[in-house]
């Protein structure tokens, strides 16, 4: 599996069945510290809050940190709880597993590195908010949320 290079990216919400839906779309957008991360269009006033520093750690997992201007402290993809539909919070950056979607070069499933019997906890979108979704590990859950990582 190809690993993502460290760098600054925009993260566009796509799906595993439609990893390249064309023009437009919604991107991971920070609203503020301890606030849910939103999915917004890549237009003013949102686009300046859509830069994310993705860094691979020694254990092969990644942190996704907000890379905006004038941030008084470091925050990134985080969580208070990993329950179905709980929001992704802009907080103390947690580690994630990035799983490349087959037949793509820049589309990944973002998974929380936790052990739950028979399921994966993955980052998706619900009503313009990034949330944690539960999918069976056997692939029977259908179309999964995925993210196109566009290098900036």
UniProtKB/Swiss-Prot annotation:
<dbReference type="Pfam" id="PF10467">
    <property type="entry name" value="Inhibitor_I48"/>
</dbReference>
<protein>
    <recommendedName>
        <fullName>Clitocypin-6</fullName>
    </recommendedName>
</protein>
<dbReference type="GO" id="GO:0004869">
    <property type="term" value="F:cysteine-type endopeptidase inhibitor activity"/>
</dbReference>
<comment type="similarity">
    <text>Belongs to the protease inhibitor I48 family.</text>
</comment>
<comment type="subunit">
    <text>Homodimer.</text>
</comment>
<comment type="function">
    <text>Binds and inhibits cysteine proteinases. Inhibits most strongly papain and cathepsin L, more weakly bromelain and cathepsin B while it is completely ineffective against cathepsin H.</text>
</comment>
<keyword id="KW-0646">Protease inhibitor</keyword>
<dbReference type="InterPro" id="IPR019508">
    <property type="entry name" value="Prot_inh_I48_clitocypin"/>
</dbReference>
<keyword id="KW-0789">Thiol protease inhibitor</keyword>
């Amino acid at each position: 599996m190809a690993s993502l290079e460290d760098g600054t990216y925009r993260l566009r919400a796509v799906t595993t069945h439609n990893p390249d839906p064309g023009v437009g779309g919604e991107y991971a957008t920070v609203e503020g510290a301890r606030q849910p991360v939103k999915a917004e269009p890549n237009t003013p006033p949102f686009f300046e809050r859509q830069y994310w520093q993705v860094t691979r750690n020694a254990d092969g997992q990644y942190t996704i940190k907000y890379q905006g201007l004038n941030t008084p402290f470091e925050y990134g993809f985080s969580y208070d709880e990993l329950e179905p539909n709980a929001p992704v919070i802009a907080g103390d950056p947690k580690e994630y597993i990035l799983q490349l979607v087959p037949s793509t070069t820049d589309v990944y499933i973002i998974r929380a590195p936790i052990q739950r019997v028979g399921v994966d906890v993955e980052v998706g979108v619900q009503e313009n908010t990034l949330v944690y979704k539960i999918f069976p590990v056997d692939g029977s859950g259908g179309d999964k949320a995925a993210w196109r990582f566009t290098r900036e």
